Amino acid sequence: MIIAKLEGVEDAFAQELNSSQPNLFNHMKRWLPDMCPKAYRWVGEMEEIAKTFDDNNLSEKLFHCVAETYMVVEKSILGKEIVEKRKKGKTAEDVTDILARFVSKN
């Protein structure tokens, strides 16, 4: 959703995803806001999965990339919030807007 926003196709992407994969779209809308303050934990999870793949002679690259994405979220204002005291990024749209601005500046 962040890339779609940065590329100016956010509405078209949301409409297509909602039309073709409504369950995934609704899951993403709920999951995105909840994930941000916990991004630091997901970095470690992805690195552990990457190691497991590598240990079993499978490519770990995807999981390193996902970990890097979580690192970006962790560095943003959303990653610094405390779950119980959240003030920003309470909707998927807010998360998308905030992270798109953050990525554009860095």
Stretches with model-predicted labels:
Residues 85-106:
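Short, basic/aromatic-enriched C-terminal tail that caps enzymatic domains
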Residues 1-87:
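Helical "substrate-binding/catalytic lid" subdomain
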